[in-house]
Design a protein with these regions (language model features):
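Acidic/His-leaning functional-site neighborhoods
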Residues: 190
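Sec-dependent signal peptide cleavage junction
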Residues: 19-53
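A short, Trp-centered hydrophobic/proline-enriched beta-strand micro-motif
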Residues: 42-71
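Bacterial Sec-dependent N-terminal signal peptides
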Residues: 1-25, 226
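Long, compositionally biased interface segments
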Residues: 187, 196-232
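Aromatic-patch recognition
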Residues: 60-187
């Protein structure tokens, strides 16, 4: 009788162990191949974990190709990972994270006519550090944009009737920021009255320009025109 009880207990424990393994496999079916990055033996080295199953839509990169870029007088083959908010560069065919320094890292990409700066900026009530694209700049006025890519977790079908949804890197709308007289970098207001109040000496002229030119405070080209008008 005791032997029978022992056999039953061992069988049940084995079943629970196998079940937990299967549950673990199900949870890890859709794992990101890009977002989980490990640092290898070399500091800053990037290694990408491979996916076991499932599809992946989109990309964490604004441009997946490594493009010639200039940083502090040196030239690198680089690309920008907007999901991780990091630049990567090639070093003897190895992908390495570029170390960014606040206020000191400027990445210029002549081929794309783009310049990134690593800055401290205000986002609502919090402050963030990251790369912003410079759209317009004078000594007293600057316009930036933040490029964003979010990771959306996929859905694994539990039965043959369920629909599978792949993991996805989704490019979000760019967010625009301004800086006046070297002050805080903050979001561009999307309402005309709030925006014109930033420029008390020019508020009427700016308001007229926005209305007469049908300027959208959410559109990159419109904002560049507007800031060029203000900066004259």
């Amino acid at each position: 009788m005791k032997k029978l009880i022992i056999y039953i207990s061992v069988f049940l424990l084995g079943s629970v162990f196998i079940f937990s393994q299967e549950k673990g496999k199900e949870k890890s079916t859709y794992e990101s191949s890009y977002q989980n990055k490990a640092v290898s033996g070399t500091p800053g080295m990037v290694t990408q974990s491979l996916r076991s199953k499932g599809d992946l839509k989109g990309s964490p990169y604004i441009n997946e190709d490594f493009i010639s870029a200039e940083v502090d007088g040196s030239t690198y083959s680089m690309r920008y990972n907007a999901h991780e908010d990091q630049f990567e560069y090639l070093d003897n065919d190895a992908v390495v994270l570029f170390p960014a320094k606040l206020g000191a890292t400027v990445v210029e990409i002549p081929r794309l006519n783009k310049k990134y700066e690593y800055l401290n900026y205000k986002d609502g009530r919090s402050y963030n550090y990251g790369f912003l694209v410079v759209l317009y700049e004078t000594d007293n006025l600057k316009l930036f944009k933040k490029e964003k890519v979010n990771f959306i977790k996929g859905v694994v079908p539990k039965t043959s009737y369920d629909r599978a949804y792949p993991d996805e890197y989704r490019r979000e709308r760019d967010v625009f920021y301004y800086q006046i007289n070297g002050g805080e970098i903050d979001r561009v207001p999307t309402r005309n009255r709030q925006f014109t109040s930033l420029f008390t000496d020019q508020s009427k002229e700016i308001d007229n320009y926005i209305k007469s030119n049908k300027i959208s405070l959410n559109d990159e080209n419109d904002l560049k025109k507007l800031f060029e008008f203000i900066g004259k």
